[in-house]
Amino acid sequence: MKTNAVKLWSLCAALTGFAEAQFQDFFNITTFPNEQKENVTKWLNEARATAGPALSAYFGHRCILGQVYPELSSATQLSGFIAPREVFDNLYYIGQSAVSAWAYDTGEGLVVFDALNNAAEAEGILVPALEKLGFAGTDIKHLVITHEHFDHYGGARWLQDNFHPATYASAPAWAAMVNVAGGPVQDKVIAEGDVLTIGNVTFNFYVTPGHTPGSLSTIFKVYDNGVEHTAGFYGGTGIPSAAAAKDQQIASMNRFADLAKEANVDTLIANHQNQDRSLYHFDLLDHRPDGGDHPYVIGGDAFDRYLRMNGQCVRVKAARDGQFLQT
């Protein structure tokens, strides 16, 4: 009996060791050797307070999951099919799980925000999504690139070559994209404060550097069964590596929060589904009772707190990285 017990203990120990070894191979535990623990504690709890219960999921994603468990964060936006759909009157989701794309039917053609990763996705996902919604690629009259990361502009050149939309980006974004093989042909430059009216929709644009130097944010009206709301679409909430870029990101987020408050923004739209919780919202829209709240409409106070909380999460990451910011 004793011999069997020893054998069982040895087997359990061996299996435990094997599991631990496999776990270490599978899961990369993030450490922060230069962490400023006092500053992390300060800003993490300030961000949590700013978020409150209503924004706790956004707080958890930006302040904790994306920083301490980046592999799990990345797993929330793996490439995958999402059925295209109308989210507001004439505003459509036409992206995939890893990166969003939006189309607004202005009455004078479609304005498309972002072009997915590459030509194959533009041809195989974005255009078929439009076709399923009753449009065609030729309806794309305007293309807005929110920032100069390839997952947002990789399909732009294919769209330009095939449908010739007027293509818009900020000057810093164009400066980066034109030097990349397969990047779009430079077209129209959007500057700070530019207003673009197409058909019955007006877009107010702001250059919000931080995530990238050329990140572009916009404010525009949306309608829910005819009821007017104002959407804020921030160009990129991902936290940059350099301290100077983090300073820019915080300043841009706080400035856009002020602009959004002046414009009475109450609706959150983003260029990744895990930043505006689109996957959750789609299911809620599918099961929305008559007269029920629209999940993208979070209210003006919550939108303001969302941006300021994101800025505080940037401070958390700086403190984890041992960086001292100027803002």
Question: Locations of the language-model features?
Answer:
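Fungal secretory targeting signals
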Residues: 1-21
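Zn-dependent metallo-beta-lactamase
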Residues: 17-109, 119
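Active-site HxH/HxHxD metal-binding segment of metal-dependent hydrolases
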Residues: 26-37, 42-45, 120-124, 128-195
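Conserved beta-strand hairpin/beta-sheet module of binuclear metal-dependent hydrolase folds
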Residues: 77-133, 217-238
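Short, hydrophobic/aromatic-rich segments at coil-to-beta transitions
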Residues: 86-92, 193, 201-204
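Extracytoplasmic/secreted proteins, especially bacterial periplasmic and envelope-associated proteins
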Residues: 89, 121, 125, 154-158, ...
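Divalent metal-coordination and catalytic microenvironments
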Residues: 90, 104, 114, 147, ...
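Metallo-beta-lactamase
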Residues: 110, 117-119, 195-197, 202-304
